Amino acid sequence: DLNVRFLNKDEYERWDSIVAALPSASIFDESKWLAAVADVMGCDIRILGVFDNDRLIGGAPLNISNKFGMPTATGIPLTPTNSCIIEPLETIFSSKATNYLLKITDAIGRFLQSNYDYAVVANHPFISDIRSFNWLGWRTQVLYTYHVDLAKADFSALPKERRKLIRKAENSGVIIERSDDFSAAHNLLAKTFRRKD
């Protein structure tokens, strides 16, 4: 049986190592991002962990609050998903990998149902099997997103209006670059919300 509980802060490094190993994960799944959003937004963000014995194998970040006296576990502000994160399973058998995924998502779903009156988990597009949530009676909705490799993208195939917006951004000096500098994102968020005070 799997054990499900919230991680202690000293376990965040292990969480981050699982996130780093996943091609589907992003900065929005990292504990530093979650801590920065919690700080800027003044909310209680926790990472739910799923353990096989003492080994962390998955989980999900959640915004914990009380709404109208009801405990809730929902998505993270300023963050596109609060996806289930699943440690990769080394196997050549797709059925074994599917069962592993379903076992972990079932544990997450059951924990949330047992402890919260309302819960939201918005998975990455790479979590393509949400049957565990369906079987538990959750209201589920599959939404679609597209991933475009910009280096290989054929911009001539884009609609005219989209090409116009891209050219306008380029002419305005907008550039996109990969960065591991977390402080840049944190500073931008802090400035954004400071202006609204």
Residue ranges and their predicted role:
Residues 53-54, 89, 149-153:
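Short loop segments at secondary-structure junctions
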Residues 49, 58-61, 118-123, 175-178:
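A structural signal for short, well-ordered beta-strand segments and their strand-loop junctions
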Residues 67-140:
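Acyl-donor binding region in acyl/amide transferases
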Residues 2-81:
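Amide-forming acyltransferase catalytic core, primarily the GNAT-like/NAT-type
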Residues 1-12, 132-197:
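Acyltransferase donor/substrate-recognition loop-hinge adjacent to the catalytic core
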Residues 16-19, 109, 186, 190:
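Non-transmembrane alpha-helical segments in soluble domains
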